[in-house]
Structure formats: C-alpha cells, structure tokens
C-alpha cells in the first residue's frame, strides 16, 4: 500500500493563524482566509443544525473555518513540505478541552479512527474524496462540512495531485490529534498531534504541532500541500452548561485582536527549514 501525506497540518491548525503572508524570500507564500462560524450540535451530522447562541459574537462559543493557499517553486516546482506550525492566540480567547471524550494517537496510528468516541470529534465528520483532481482548485467554503486538502504526491516516478480528508480529535492531555485520509491515487492514512501551550505579551495561548516528512516512494520528493479548508470547533452540553473548545473574548482591543503564526517549510534537517512569520490583526465581532 502506497502511503503519502499532503503537508497540511496547517489546519487546522492554521486554524487561527489569521492572514499569514510569507516574509522570507526562499519560503513559500501562504494566503489564509478565516471565518467564525456557529458550532454543530453533532460533528457526525454536518447537516444536523447548530448550537444556539454560538458564532461570531463577543463572549460566544464558536468554530473557526480556515482556508489557505500555498504557492512556491523552491521544491522542484512546488512549495516545500510543512514541517511545523505554531499559532499564537490573543488574550481573552478561551480554550477548553476538559470534559470532552478523547481519541488517543495510538488509535489513529493503528489506522482505526472508527474506534474513536463520536464526541471526541473536534471537526465535522466526512469521507475521503473518491476522485483525484488534475489541479488543486481554490479552497472552497465548507459550510460546516468535513475538512479537505489538496496537494502533490509522488506516484510511479511522477508528481500528481491528490485530495484528502482532514479530521480533528480531542487528544488525551488537552491537545488535538489529526488524521489525514486519502484513497486515490495513493492510499493516505497519516496521524499526528499538537498541544496548546502558554504564551505571553499580547497572546494568551499558542498551539504547536510538528508534521513528519512522508515520502510516497523511496528517494522521491515528499508530499506537499497547496490548498486546504478545515473547520475546528466543538461543544457538548453538561447539564445546562454548554462547554466549547473555543470561546471568543468578551472585549476586543482597538484595531482588532492580535494574532501570530509561524510555519516551517523544508524537506531536509531542521537547520535547513524556512520559517514564515506574520503578526496580524483580526477584526472585532460586530456588536
């Protein structure tokens, strides 16, 4: 079975790296669009309705849809693989993982995501695309649907495009685990995890994840990401209280919420990776 991984950990993980643009000449360029959404009542049923009083409001529980496009030619005509992502969140953003069922990384490494508790889903459920595109289209709005990504993989000595599903799960210890699945033209089953950490200054928390370099063929170029769309956000009811993974701050600084994202690209040792960094202002919700 051939295995590949589209370098798209930025999912959601870029789940809050708002408005990234490359500042390094040798690194890829990353364009990000973000939309705050209400939270699905049931992540396993994307058309099952949303929790009331969630979405883009001050102090409200919310989900975050992130769409991004990566461009570059430094890796044989394509962007280099993503190796690490760090996302800083503004002060006042509440992140809560306690109380949610979890799915262990070992379960995903065993390629048994069906054994994960349904309430451990941190993103809408879906199925891997059953057809491969000739080229990656612009990332489309999900409207509460499952995360998808498109990129380039090596197959039979050539570079071809492939689309995959992205699924996020609550992880033991308070982080998030991700599972990327594709069926054509290569079989893709790639798990990885990330953790929330403390931050200082303008930021309250940060999320950090590392992505393994995956080669489809020995000695062939690794898989890379070109576009992705993913929604991260979940909530459960405990008695009369709604517990949400993410909650918007009750106040917004003049000019918007500060945000920061760093992404490392490369196929060699860590010392050769190129880092893309940007600090941005996220518009305040309308009152």
Where are these regions (language model features)?
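Ser/Thr/Pro/Gly-rich, low-complexity intrinsically disordered stalk/linker tracts of secreted
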Residues: 25-287
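Bacterial N-terminal signal peptides that target proteins for export
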Residues: 1-10
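N-terminal regions of proteins, emphasizing targeting and processing segments when present
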Residues: 10-13, 36
């Amino acid at each position: 079975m051939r295995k590949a991984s589209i370098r798209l950990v930025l999912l959601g993980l870029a789940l809050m790296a708002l408005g990234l643009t490359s500042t390094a000449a040798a690194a890829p360029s990353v364009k990000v669009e973000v939309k705050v959404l209400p939270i699905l009542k049931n992540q396993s049923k994307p058309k099952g309705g949303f929790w009331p009083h969630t979405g883009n409001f001050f102090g409200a529980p919310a989900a975050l849809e992130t769409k991004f496009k990566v461009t570059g030619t430094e890796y044989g005509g394509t962007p280099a693989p993503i190796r690490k992502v760090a996302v800083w969140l503004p002060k006042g953003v509440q992140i809560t993982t306690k109380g949610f069922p979890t799915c262990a990384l070992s379960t995903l490494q065993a390629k048994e995501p069906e054994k994960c508790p349904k309430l451990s889903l941190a993103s809408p459920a879906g199925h891997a695309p059953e057809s491969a595109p000739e080229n990656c289209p612009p990332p489309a709005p999900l409207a509460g649907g499952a995360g998808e990504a498109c990129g380039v993989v090596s197959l039979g000595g050539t570079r071809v495009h492939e689309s995959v599903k992205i699924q996020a799960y609550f992880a033991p210890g308070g982080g998030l685990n991700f599972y990327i699945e594709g069926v054509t033209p290569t079989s893709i089953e790639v798990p990885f995890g990330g953790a929330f950490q403390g931050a200082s200054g303008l930021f309250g928390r940060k999320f950090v994840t590392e992505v393994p370099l995956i080669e489809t063929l020995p000695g062939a170029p690794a898989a890379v990401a070109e576009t992705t769309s993913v929604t991260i956000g979940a909530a459960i009811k405990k008695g009369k209280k709604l517990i949400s993974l993410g909650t918007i701050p009750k106040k917004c600084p003049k000019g918007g919420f500060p945000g920061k994202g760093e992404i490392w690209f490369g196929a060699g040792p860590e010392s050769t990776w190129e880092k893309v960094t940007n600090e941005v202002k996220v518009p305040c919700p309308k009152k």
